[in-house]
């Protein structure tokens, strides 16, 4: 206890706070307590850190091994595809030019048929569009003609002519009724 009070006394008489680097002047008991506490609590923390690091390393190694196996499988599959392609290349070379020429002719024939179908479809579409436009123009012309006729009739009809037209139409309807009876 005397050492503790001496240290407080020496602190108050000291000119400032400083670190005593002389190991012989420091209190060995205090240092051993601090080191003991650090070792006791630090051991668990350090152990946890090392365990976590060990788990991360082992999981990384395991995933790397799995990736390596996957890459090896993919490499084997790629080699198998390469062998198949090489076999097909040899087969095509054996069959030779005649097969290629036949396929070329078939493609040309199919393209020609498709072209004719597209041409027919284009012509049919143009024809239908022309008919639609003609029908639309006819409707517009008919509508305009009816509007002009109505305008002409309305401008020329007076009440007397209007009454005569109505009477004439009534007479026509009566005559048609008599014929059907």
Swiss-Prot record:
Places the protein is found: Plastid, Chloroplast thylakoid membrane
CDD domains associated with the record: ATP-synt_Fo_b
UniProt keyword Transferase, yes or no: no
Metal-binding in keyword set: no
Example of a GO cellular component annotation carried by this entry: chloroplast thylakoid membrane
GO MF annotation terms: proton-transporting ATP synthase activity, rotational mechanism
Alphabetic keyword roster: ATP synthesis, CF(0), Chloroplast, Hydrogen ion transport, Ion transport, Membrane, Plastid, Thylakoid, Transmembrane, Transmembrane helix, Transport
Membrane-spanning parts: 28-50
Family matches, as InterPro entries: ATP_synth_b/b'su_bac/chlpt
One Pfam short name: ATP-synt_B
Membrane topology: Single-pass membrane protein
Assigned protein family: Belongs to the ATPase B chain family.
Further remark: In plastids the F-type ATPase is also known as CF(1)CF(0).
Role according to the record: F(1)F(0) ATP synthase produces ATP from ADP in the presence of a proton or sodium gradient. F-type ATPases consist of two structural domains, F(1) containing the extramembraneous catalytic core and F(0) containing the membrane proton channel, linked together by a central stalk and a peripheral stalk. During catalysis, ATP synthesis in the catalytic domain of F(1) is coupled via a rotary mechanism of the central stalk subunits to proton translocation. Component of the F(0) channel, it forms part of the peripheral stalk, linking F(1) to F(0).
Quaternary data: F-type ATPases have 2 components, F(1) - the catalytic core - and F(0) - the membrane proton channel. F(1) has five subunits: alpha(3), beta(3), gamma(1), delta(1), epsilon(1). F(0) has four main subunits: a(1), b(1), b'(1) and c(10-14). The alpha and beta chains form an alternating ring which encloses part of the gamma chain. F(1) is attached to F(0) by a central stalk formed by the gamma and epsilon chains, while a peripheral stalk is formed by the delta, b and b' chains.
Protein's recorded name: ATP synthase subunit b, chloroplastic
Gene that specifies this protein: atpF
């Amino acid at each position: 206890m005397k050492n503790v009070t001496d240290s407080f006394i020496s602190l108050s008489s000291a000119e400032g706070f400083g670190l005593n680097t002389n190991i012989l002047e420091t209190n060995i008991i205090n240092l051993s307590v601090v080191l003991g506490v650090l070792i006791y609590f630090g051991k668990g923390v350090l152990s946890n850190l090392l365990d976590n690091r060990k788990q991360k390393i082992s999981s990384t190694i395991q995933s790397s091994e799995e990736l390596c196996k996957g890459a090896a499988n993919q490499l084997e599959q790629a080699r198998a595809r390469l062998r198949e392609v090489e076999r097909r290349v040899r087969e095509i070379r054996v069959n030779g030019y005649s097969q290629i020429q036949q396929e070329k002719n078939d493609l040309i024939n199919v393209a020609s048929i498709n072209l004719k179908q597209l041409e027919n479809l284009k012509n049919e579409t143009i024809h239908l569009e022309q008919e639609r436009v003609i029908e639309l123009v006819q409707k517009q012309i008919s509508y305009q003609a009816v509007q002009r006729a109505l305008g002409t009739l309305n401008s020329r009809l007076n009440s007397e002519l209007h009454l005569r037209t109505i009477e004439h139409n009534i007479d026509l309807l009566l005559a048609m009724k008599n014929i059907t009876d």
